[in-house]
């Protein structure tokens, strides 16, 4: 590449490969430098979800602080009040659940379905998931098998029943005979624990990808508790991702991850529990039991289709 140097000094000309006395050829006009348009001053604001509110609530029962998210339909409540669904892991799951409920509200004149109030139960944290807090609150006592930092499910259920529900019912008209609980993973385990130990707390239970394996499958020993309150006739939906027991090719990797998936038996445990409960449905006082396997979903991705299926099941 030729470099033409303007200035005429012999030394510079020599350095440029021109003989002394030679005249450098005129340089081509410099290309115009593109000037970026001035960036207007902007003031980004935190995005908010329409028709949603939140507050931080300290619990006397658990001694913990929770972030409560609330979305109320803009449609008039039925005479008995709005149905309501309580959604665990509220920081992560509430936005999707609230948008799904708003879709129901927009189509209510066509479908005849009443959109529910959505209550997200989260934590006063900037994270989507507060792992230590959910491990504490969502796991049952399990007769000493729960481990350190776990086993607080009964106190957390007390918080929902004794502190949170009265607050929600004071905020908007609620149909106390149309209440649902949704939980995923440890939250799904908590949902089963609530069903088996306090079946009158909700009318619909949605256990998504429940961690039945926890504490040597302790939650299965709680099933007989249903029979003590069979007059309440609760409904149960179990969901699980197809890929929760074995990773999908070509991403599957042999070794530790595959062994953990196989050991937890997420898909088999959900299926087996559904079969067991269906066989004893009348004796246990269950109105309905259903299990849905979500195609090509893993443990994390199964949350969102489970929310959709759970909302549909609740409103049927």
Predicted segments — roles?
Residues 14-15, 24, 97, 248:
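Residue-level recognition of conserved structural "scaffold" positions that shape functional pockets
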Residues 6-7, 17, 138-140:
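General helical structural elements
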Residues 15-16, 22, 191, 196:
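Ubiquitous "structural anchor" signal
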Residues 11-12, 21, 25, 67:
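Intrinsically disordered, low-complexity, compositionally biased regions/tails
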Residues 32-316:
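Non-catalytic cap/lid and distal C-terminal segments of serine-dependent acyl enzymes
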Residues 18-33:
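Signal peptide processing junction and immediate N-terminal pro/mature segment
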Residues 1-13:
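N-terminal export leaders
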């Amino acid at each position: 590449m030729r470099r033409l140097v303007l200035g005429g000094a012999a030394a510079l000309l020599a350095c440029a490969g021109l003989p002394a006395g030679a005249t450098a050829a005129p340089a081509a006009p410099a290309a115009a430098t593109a000037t970026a348009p001035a960036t207007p001053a902007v003031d980004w604001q935190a995005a908010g979800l329409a028709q949603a509110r939140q507050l931080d609530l300290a619990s006397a029962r658990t001694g913990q602080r929770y972030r409560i998210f609330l979305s109320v339909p803009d449609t008039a409540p039925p005479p008995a009040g709005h149905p309501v669904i309580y959604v665990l892991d509220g920081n992560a799951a509430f936005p999707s659940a609230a948008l799904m409920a708003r879709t129901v509200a927009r189509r209510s004149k066509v479908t005849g379905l009443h959109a529910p109030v959505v209550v997200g139960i989260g934590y006063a944290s900037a994270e989507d998931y507060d792992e230590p807090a959910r491990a504490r609150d969502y796991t049952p006592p399990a007769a000493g098998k729960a481990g350190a930092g776990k086993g607080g499910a009964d106190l957390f259920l007390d918080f929902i029943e004794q502190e949170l529900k009265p607050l929600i019912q004071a905020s908007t008209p609620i149909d106390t005979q149309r209440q649902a609980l949704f939980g995923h993973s440890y939250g799904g385990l908590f949902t089963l624990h609530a069903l088996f130990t306090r079946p009158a707390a909700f009318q619909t239970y949605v256990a998504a990808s429940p961690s039945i394996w926890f504490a040597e499958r302790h939650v299965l020993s709680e099933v007989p508790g249903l029979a003590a309150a069979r007059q309440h006739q609760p409904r149960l939906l179990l969901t699980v991702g197809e890929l929760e027991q074995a990773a999908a090719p070509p991403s599957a990797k042999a070794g530790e991850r595959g062994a953990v998936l196989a050991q937890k038996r997420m898909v088999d445990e959900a299926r087996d529990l559904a079969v067991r409960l269906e066989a004893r449905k009348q004796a246990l006082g269950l109105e309905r039991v259903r299990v849905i396997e979500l195609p090509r979903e893993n443990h994390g991705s199964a949350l969102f289709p489970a929310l959709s299926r759970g909302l549909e099941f609740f409103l049927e």
